[in-house]
Every structure is written in C-alpha cells, then in structure tokens.
Amino acid sequence: MILEDTDLPLSHEQPSYSQIKDVLDKIPTGEHLWDLPKYEEKIILNWLIKLLATNLEWITVEEERDYLVSTICERIAERSGRLAAPTRKREFSLSNGVSVVLREPTMTYNTLGFKTWGSAPLLSANLPKWEDLSNSINALELGAGTGLVGISAAIQLGWQVVCTDLPDIVENMQYNVDYNSELIQQYAGSVSCHVLDWMNPPDDDNRPSWLIKPFQRIIASDCIYETHFGELAIALFRKYLAKDGIVITEYPLRETHLEEIGVFEKGMDAAGFERQMGEEIGEEDFGSLYPVTCRWSRWKYHG
C-alpha cells in the first residue's frame, strides 16, 4: 500500500524532485489504476491536485520540473474524468430560470481555474436566498476561475461584479463573460475581469481604478487548499471590504484540506469577523467517489 510505505511529501515543505518522483513511481497506473482502496485513492488524488497547484516553483531544473508536471497531469487525467476532458462548454441553470454557458479548457498544471469546482454552483444557487435584487451592490470575486459565481450574481441579483484571478485564468474568464454579456446586461448587472495576484496585490498608492472603491461584497469559492492562501485571503478581505460589507465563502470540506480550512476560519475569527454558516452536499468532478460536504459562510467584520 502506497500510504503505508510512503509519507506523501507536503507541498509547503517544497519536497525535492526525487521525493516527488519516488511517490509518483509508486502510484498505480495503467491496468493497475484502481488497485488502491477508495480512501487511499481519494487521498492520492487530492495530493496530486494540491501539488500541481503550486506549479512546483522550487524545482529549479527545468527538465525535472517538466517531467514531474507531465507525470502528475497524467496521473490526474487517469483518475479524473471531466477534469482532464478537452475544451468544452457547459451549461448551468440559475435560480431565475436563466442558463449560462461557460467554456472550460483542458486543465494544465497552472490552470486549475479552468474548471468549475464543486462549491461554485452551490454558491451561485445560494446567493439569491441570501441577497435581495439590487444593482447598487458592488462585489469582488477572488479566484473567480471560470466566472460562474460572478456571472450568476450579475444575472440573478443585478450586481456590479469584478472577477479576478491569475493571467492565464482571466483570459478564459473574459471569454465567458463576453459569451454571456447579453444576459448580464438584460438583468442590469455588470462583470469585469482583472488580474489580481494574492501574493502581489497592488500597493495602496498604485491601485487600479477598479480597486479604489471598497466592495460591499467579497466572494471566494473553493480557494482554501493551501494554508497561506487563507492568510492571503484574509489580508485581501481587510484591504478591500467596505466597513459594512460581507465576505461570502464556500469550500468543500475535503479531508486533506481540513487543517488549512481550520487555520483560515481561526484567522477570520482573530481578524474580527463573525459569521453565519451552514453545510450542504456538493459534487466534485471526480466521479462517484467524490460527493463532498461544502461549508458556506457569510462573514461580517466586527473588529
């Protein structure tokens, strides 16, 4: 059993090429793909995705890094169904009876945001339950990915939404916004797409025009899969949220990410946020192994 023989190296410890390769070599593939019991397969797949999300930036030898990235993508592709599917368009039905269409390109090692993850459709469905129709609400979405939540907020609630992510993700997000632009305008909403790197946000003296005004809502869906992501998100909330604003989060309670989620939630408490919360069942894109409990929260600042 791989988990009895090997401790999976943690990404935040920046494991070496040989450490990662040793584990990859032991992961069943080909005709032995499903030799692992379900609980081990779940842990392995989460480890692969989490490792991939780091871009393996600490592996400085390009050939070694390329090999690891390629192998990780192959292992994920074998296990992931739609995750590794070629570029296609998906249709999502909203609570007001409208359907939006999103393009999802094939995922690569640095483009996890090309897929619409399990908590995003749930959060899109929840927004009209919590919020009234108002085209005066300005909202910032962090890690917006395909743009589903931001687009749905504009169409269902008439919000003025700024969707942000990394450069490679924003290009596809903009395509999705343009594709659904007539619906967005029909419901008096708006969506703009911009690059926002959590690790390198603009200095206060050099904020772009779209970041100058505080946001009444900040949305983050399925963004807590590294400990430092939670810390960075909290810093952005405090930086860009209006005094009377609300932070809206939802994320799957994946077994391998409970520590990161715990750090994030304690950090929000320590930063002076109080919340309403609940849990519901969502579906990951990994087949029948992956129905998952998702936790939503509406955070208000009381610092």
From Swiss-Prot:
Similarity comment text for this entry: Belongs to the class I-like SAM-binding methyltransferase superfamily. METTL21 family.
Binding of S-adenosyl-L-methionine, residues: 117, 143-145, 165, 198, 221
EC number per UniProt: 2.1.1.-
Molecular function GO labels: protein methyltransferase activity; protein-lysine N-methyltransferase activity
Keyword annotations: Cytoplasm, Methyltransferase, Nucleus, S-adenosyl-L-methionine, Transferase
Signal peptide: none
UniProt xrefs under InterPro entries: Methyltransf_16 (IPR019410), SAM-dependent_MTases_sf (IPR029063)
Source organism phylogeny: Eukaryota, Fungi, Dikarya, Ascomycota, Taphrinomycotina
Signals that turn on the gene: By glucose, sucrose and fructose.
Coiled-coil ranges per UniProt: none
Role noted for this protein: S-adenosyl-L-methionine-dependent protein-lysine N-methyltransferase that methylates elongation factor 2 and elongation factor 3A.
Top-level class of the enzyme under EC nomenclature: transferase
Protein known as: Protein-lysine N-methyltransferase rrg1
Cell compartments where the protein resides: Cytoplasm; Nucleus
Originating species: Schizosaccharomyces pombe (strain 972 / ATCC 24843) (Fission yeast)
Cross-referenced CDD domains: AdoMet_MTases (cd02440)
GO cellular component entries: cytosol; nucleus
Biological process according to GO: methylation; regulation of cytoplasmic translation
